[in-house]
C-alpha cells in the first residue's frame, strides 16, 4: 500500500511543479529503515527522525494504512498559504468493519467513532502544522499511540486554522499497517507467555 501512496504523492508533486510552480516547494521525506518487527527502530523514532530532517514551514505525516485524493497535495499547499497554525480537512476512516466520516477542526472535541453521523475530531498528525511548533516536541520511542501523544502537545500552540470541507484523505484500520502488526505481535507474545506458565 505504501508504494501506491508514494507514487500518488509524486504524481501530484510533478503536477504541482509543472502547473503551479509559483506555489512553492514541497518536500516528501520517507524513512526506509527496517520495520520494527524486522529489528528496525520504533515508529516513534522513525517519525522523530523525519521531523528533524524536515525543512519546510509546515509538516505532516502519511502512513502505510492511509490514502489520498487526487487533489490532496494542491489543496494542502493552497491552505498552507493562508499562514494558519494548522490545516484541517475531512477524512474517511474504516474502523471495526465500518466507514465513518471524520471532520477535523482545531476546536472540535474528540467524538467517538460512529458510522451513523459525522465524527468531529481535533487535528491529527496527518494535518499540516507549523514546523516551528512541531519541532518543539519529540515523539516517544513507542509503536502505538505515539502520534496522538505527540500531536496533543503540538496543538497547544495552535490558535488559527485553515480548513477545507473537502474529503482528501482516508484511513483504513486493519492488519496491514506496521503499528497493527506490532500490536498483534505483542498480544500474541502475551498470550503465548500465559500458556507457557
Please state what every model-predicted region is.
Residues 59:
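Short aromatic/hydrophobic "clamp" motif used to bind/position activated sugar donors
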Residues 87-101:
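Short beta-strand-to-loop element that shapes/binds the nucleotide-sugar donor at the catalytic cleft/hinge
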Residues 94, 109-129:
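A recurrent flexible, glycine/aromatic-enriched loop bordering the glycosyltransferase active site
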Residues 144-150:
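Acidic donor-binding loop at a coil-to-helix junction in glycosyltransferase catalytic cores
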Residues 164-196:
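Active-site donor/metal-binding and catalytic loop motifs
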Amino acid at each position: 500500500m505504501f508504494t501506491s501512496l508514494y507514487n500518488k504523492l509524486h504524481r501530484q508533486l510533478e503536477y504541482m511543479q509543472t502547473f503551479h510552480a509559483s506555489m512553492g516547494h514541497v518536500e516528501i521525506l520517507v524513512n526506509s529503515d527496517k520495520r520494527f518487527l524486522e529489528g528496525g527502530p520504533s515508529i516513534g523514532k522513525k517519525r522523530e527522525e523525519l521531523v528533524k530532517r524536515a525543512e519546510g514551514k509546515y509538516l505532516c505525516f502519511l502512513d502505510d494504512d492511509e490514502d489520498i485524493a487526487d487533489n490532496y497535495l494542491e489543496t494542502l499547499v493552497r491552505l498552507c498559504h493562508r499562514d494558519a497554525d494548522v490545516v484541517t480537512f475531512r477524512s474517511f476512516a474504516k474502523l471495526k468493519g465500518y466507514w465513518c466520516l471524520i471532520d477535523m477542526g482545531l476546536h472540535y472535541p474528540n467524538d467517538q467513532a460512529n458510522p451513523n453521523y459525522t465524527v468531529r475530531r481535533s487535528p491529527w498528525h496527518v494535518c499540516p502544522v507549523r514546523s516551528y511548533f512541531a519541532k518543539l516536541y519529540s515523539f516517544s520511542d513507542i509503536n502505538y499511540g505515539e502520534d496522538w501523544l505527540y500531536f496533543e502537545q503540538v496543538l497547544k500552540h495552535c490558535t488559527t486554522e485553515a480548513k477545507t470541507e473537502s474529503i482528501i484523505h482516508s484511513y483504513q484500520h486493519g492488519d496491514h499497517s506496521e503499528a497493527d502488526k506490532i500490536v498483534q505481535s505483542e498480544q500474541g507474545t502475551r498470550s503465548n507467555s500465559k500458556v507457557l506458565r
